[in-house]
Amino acid sequence: MFRKKEMKYRGINVWVACLCLLLAACDKEDNNDSNNFATGIVELPALRNGANDVFVTHYTTFNGQKVTSFSMEYDKSKKHSRWIAFRFDNQTKQQNVSRSDEPFDADPAIGSQYQRVQADFGKQGYDRGHLCASADRLYSREVNEQTFYYTNMSPQRNKFNTGIWLTLEGQVQSWGRSCTSSDTLYVVKGGTIDKEDQIRGYISNDLSKPIPKYYYMALLFKKGDSFKAIAFWMEHTDTPKSTKLVDYALSIDELEEKTGIDFFPNLNDNLENALEATYSTKAWPGLE
């Protein structure tokens, strides 16, 4: 829950048993018109709902079922997503295709005039960095192609995009693909675009095209009836402060204070408060 907790606990292994059926109401699917009311999908942060903000969920049909690809809150005035949210479960963790050869393209759900184009990246010295990585969505060709929408792109320095950020993405994919039929890893990713001291600069000095100074992830892992949570915060730089992912870990509460975003607000309040106040690096295999 997005408010300051009176106490913070670091390095404590917390697995919270949830005996209520809180997820039953939380997994309903919403459509792209839900920008004006709270959604119940577990992975989604609280919507900012600013005048220039648009909430979009992309779907695919997989094995005859409608499946959520990923969701985003997109700021049209900054031509950048505030966050991207998705999940790994027994279905979406599958690796049935390789990276798409499809070109980067405009997102059909948002007017192209509100999106960046190729010239905003390479010629400016930045990669077209996926927020929802291509390797995050490999269960079908259609979903992988959706990750190449420009609304899912963020200007990233190549050494960051192919370095420590890629390392974190790979670790998250490993956790996600460890899911069994009763497990789900909920993921939120983003770059900072709202606070001036968290903006690295602007493409061509255009204030509608900020470059994030920091990138983050918020993770919630449901394993059976137990939960754990952790977050990561990385400065967008060519030279990382560390090559160890553990050095970037923090609690969800701490990430909320940095970003001003309320993560996982659809959880039961007591569960949310307990999960977000602390984290244990030992609870996440491969982190230490």
Residue ranges, per PLM feature:
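Bacterial N-terminal signal peptides
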Residues: 15-22
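Bacterial N-terminal signal peptides that target proteins for export
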Residues: 2-15
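Domain-level detector for secreted/extracellular nuclease and nuclease-toxin modules, and
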Residues: 2, 26-288
